[in-house]
Amino acid sequence: MAQNITLQFVEEKDLENLENVKLLFTEYSNSLNIDLCFQDFNNELKTLPGKYKKPSGSLILAFVDENLAGCVALKKLEGKICELKRLYVRNQFRGLKIGKILLEEIIEEAKKFGYTHMRLDTLPSMKSAQGLYEKFGFYDIEPYTYNPIEGARYMELKL
């Protein structure tokens, strides 16, 4: 039976979905087995939507048959450059192309905001995510932000 995948943009006053974002961001962080304190992660959770607030940022949730399945975020870096953050799909929903759907939507959102480039950093252990980024045309760049994890990969997409 086909599953119904829906996306929802999270607005500043949408308290229920901001809680869903916190839940998924926390699951994402726990899945990495590293401390994201170098990204001021705890403050990020406390101040949501924070740097992901429109008109320069965005938060998107994915649902499968109304079950919370995944998320992605976008924030302004500088000028016309944005950063992709927190692309995450829960284990039980992997294989349904939700990561691809979220990535397509956040790229379109970045274009609407007038960004010309999207950057990201990813960990060496995230091979499937890196493969997805490569399929979308992301290419390797020099480090643009601090990441203490050895082998972190920095990528960019021309929008």
Swiss-Prot record:
EC code(s) of this entry: 2.3.1.-
CDD domains, sorted: NAT_SF
Keywords, sorted A to Z: Acyltransferase, Transferase
Ranges where the N-acetyltransferase domain occurs: 5-159
Gene3D superfamilies to which the protein is assigned, alphabetical: 3.40.630.30
Enzyme class: transferase
PANTHER family: FAMILY N-ACETYLTRANSFERASE, PUTATIVE (AFU_ORTHOLOGUE AFUA_2G01380)-RELATED (PTHR43305:SF1)
Originating organism: Clostridioides difficile (strain 630)
Classification via PROSITE patterns: GNAT
GO molecular function: acyltransferase activity, transferring groups other than amino-acyl groups
Binding of CoA, residues: 87-89, 95, 131-133
Name of the protein in question: Acetyltransferase CD1211
Function: Catalyzes the transfer of an acetyl group from acetyl coenzyme A (AcCoA) to an acceptor substrate and releases both CoA and the acetylated product. It prefers L-threonine, L-serine and L-methionine. It can also use O-acetyl-L-serine, L-tryptophan, L-isoleucine, L-valine, L-homoserine, 7-aminocephalosporanic acid, thiamine pyrophosphate and thiamine.
